[in-house]
Amino acid sequence: PKSMDDLNSFVTKEIGDVQLLFNNAGVAPAELQSIWDTKPNDWNWAYGVNVMGVVHGIQAFVPSMLAHDKDARVINTCSGNGAFINLPSTPIYTSSKAAVSSITEVLKLQLEQMQSKIKVSILFPGPHTVRTNLFSAERNRPEELARDPNAPEHPISSVEDMVEMMKTLG
């Protein structure tokens, strides 16, 4: 989108050629339900941020990184949930982070085929849940992607709650 293109123009003008692109986007909708009980707005919001945020970063910055032909790196933040394990309690978040993992691998292969100087990495924070605002991301949710008011409340409100839930997985 234009906002990412504008960011690239601003950074290039103020700092110079971009040599490090760090795509770090993540929201976790209130889930803990079966896939068939989830709502389209939950999918649209999470995929819009978690997946398309990474895609938009790549689309806005990689072409200019290729053009200046310098050593550079793209780092995409992922999650072990979706890349290494698939928690059944978070189908939307899990599948969105699996998509980020796949996008990162494809980007790496495409740039290698071009013999580009851009290297691609994936970051998996952890190995445990990192204390972030991921579980309170609803505060930034766009109104047009509002949560279903009839959906059950999210029983996980803190990292400690997540740890307790994980203990039950066996």
Features from the language model and the residues they span:
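Conserved NAD(P)H cofactor-binding loop of Rossmann-fold oxidoreductase domains
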Residues: 25-30
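Substrate-binding pocket helix/loop in short-chain dehydrogenase/reductase
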Residues: 32-35, 39-45
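A short, exposed helix-loop element centered on a Lys and neighboring polar residues
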Residues: 58-59
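Conserved amphipathic alpha-helix within the SDR
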Residues: 2-16
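Catalytic loop of short-chain dehydrogenase/reductase
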Residues: 75-99, 105, 109-113, 126-129, ...
